[in-house]
Amino acid sequence: MLQKRKINLFLFAAFILLAESVFISCAKKTEEKKAIQEDFSEFEFNGKKLHGKKIQPDYATQFCIYEYEDGFSLIDICGKEKYLIVPEEKYSEGLTCAADGIIKRGMENIYLASSSAYSLWDALGASGKLGFSSIKENDWYIPSASDAMKSGKMLYAGKYRMPDYELLLKSGCKLAIESTMILHVPKVKEKLEQLGIGVFTDYSSYENNPLGRLEWIKVYGEISGCQEAAFSFFNSQANLLKNIIFDSKEIRSSYFYINTRGMAVVRSPDNYVSNMLKCAGSDYLCPKIKNDTDLASRPTLSVSMEEFYKSSKTADFLFYDGNIDPSCTSLAMLKEKNPLLAEFTAVKNGKVWCAKKLIYQDTAEICQIILDMNKIFSAADDKEIFFFERLK
C-alpha cells in the first residue's frame, strides 16, 4: 500500500512539473531581444527634445514603445525602423525628426496590406479607421472584415506588390500598414512614400511566441489612440491561458499538410504554431534539424513522407493545415494523399483535426485557438471546438 502511494505521489509530482514547464514555455516573458536596441528615452522632434520612458513588452521581441510628455510616443521595431506617433492636435505637415516615419495618432483611411493585423484593430473597436484592403472580399474569413468590404466601408486597393496608387491618393490615404512581404518589393514602398503615403511595416510574423504576436495589439493601440483598450484586451486574453487543463499523460502532436509534390510540410520546432500546441499541453513532433540555423528559422519545413512518418507516426493528434490545402475534408481523402498516413496512430484512432481558414487571419483569437487545442487534447465534445474540424 505504501509503495503504491509513493508511485502515485511520484506521478502527481511529474504531472505538476509537466504542466508548469508547458505553461512557462508559452508564457515566458521577454528576457532577451534578438537585436541590441538603442535607447530612445530622449528623442529630438522638430528641434525639441522629448523625454519619456520605455515600455518593454511582456512577450514580444520585435518592438518596444517609448512614451513621452504631451502624448507623443515612439514605436521602435527592434532597431530596424522607428515611428513617431504624434497626437492629432499637435500634428501638421512638414514635421521633422530622426524617425523613419511620423504618424498622426487616430488617422483614418489606412491601407491595410497585413491581413493578420485586421482582427487586432477590430478588437480595439478601431477597424473603421481601415479604409482599404490588399485582399478582396471573398478572401476575408473574418465576418466583420468581409462585411466592411461588402458595404463599401473598406475598399479593395490592390495587392501589396501592386497597390492602386490612384485610388489611395484620391481618397486621401496617408498610411499603409504592410507585412514584411513589402521588403521584397522595395520600389513599391519607395513609390508610396514619394506620394506622401507613410509605410509602417508589421514584423509580428517574426514573433515565435504566440503571446508575442498578440501583443502587437499594443502597437496598434498607440497608432489608433486606443492604448488603454489594447492593454486591457491583451491582459484579458493572456489570462485565458490559466484555464488550460493539463493531462497527466504525455501528449504528442504534429501540424502539417501535403504539398503538390507529395512532401509533408511541417511547422518548424520553434514556430508560433508549434508553440501554440506546446502551450495547449502537447509535445510537438517533427523531423530533427541537424545544426542548420537557417532551416530552424523558417516557419515551415518540407520533408519526405518517410521522414515525416519516422518523426510523427506515434503522434496522439495530427493537425492538418486546411488553410493551405483545403482539399482534405475526410480521413479517406487524407489517406489518398499517401498510404503511409494510414499507419499513423492519430489516423487509426480518428484524432486528426483540420484547421479552418480563419485561423491565420484572426490574430486576436490566438489564446482562444490555444484553448481549442487544449479542449481537443482533453477529449471535449467536438461541438465545443470552433477553429478546427475533426476529419472523419
Annotated model-derived regions:
Residues 2-12:
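Bacterial N-terminal signal peptides that target proteins for export
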Residues 73-79, 83-169, 175-181:
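A short, structured surface patch at a secondary-structure boundary
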